[in-house]
């Protein structure tokens, strides 16, 4: 049995035993608090960071399968891989601040911090209290320093302006109609789309040369007139990178990585970069995509 399997079954056994009438997810959150130092060091001293990360992902998948709640889906690691490569092209190994405004389980930031060679100052924002607790626990086990903010990311945030804001942007509707009125991209009537408000909020917290790297449903880009006006007057849409077709069951679920910046920025070319990422299994095609992206960057 591999170390990964040993760790998974060790934690899974305890979580199942402690679950009682509650959910596996709640039991996992409680167990990973590891208030007993002996339990904590038993994991940290005997298992690699990679095994801890993978075990967490498998445990989380089991927990989310039981909950059967689409809003609790996690960002696939391959998407984080694409974004980590984009950030390496943009920043090489510079120290930069990176915030995720819809961090959920923390999986996006976990993968980014382990896949990338960059030196990142990380901030995680999520409204869900259980997810915030879960993140605190797993980042503690991974010995990764992350500022975790448990609040609605669409409310005012007490953070500095960021070099990079990433998010796998939620697509549903935002329930707080009063707060949505603070946004230019709020709907003229009824509930506003989360995705549009997240794009605007990301722009609000970017520094002058910061870059928003957001995963959005592609149909968001084909929506309301106020979004087109916002693009003309308030931000730049610098790149639309469509994810591989094979990742989605049908065209309506298609997602893209978009890069946004503030007006008057000098980090990215103003000419929009349009591309579709080849499957990561197509090594030659993927290498060509990265080369095209680097060539585009050199045009600024």
Stretches found by the model and what they are:
Residues 76-167, 172, 218:
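Conserved S-adenosyl-L-methionine
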Residues 169-198:
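Mobile active-site "lid"/loop adjacent to the S-adenosyl-L-methionine
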Residues 171-173, 219-221, 247, 263-265:
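Conserved nucleotide-binding/hydrolysis micro-motifs of P-loop NTPases
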Residues 191-246, 253:
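Conserved Class I SAM-dependent methyltransferase catalytic core
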Residues 252-300:
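Flexible, glycine-/basic-rich loop-and-beta segments that form/coincide
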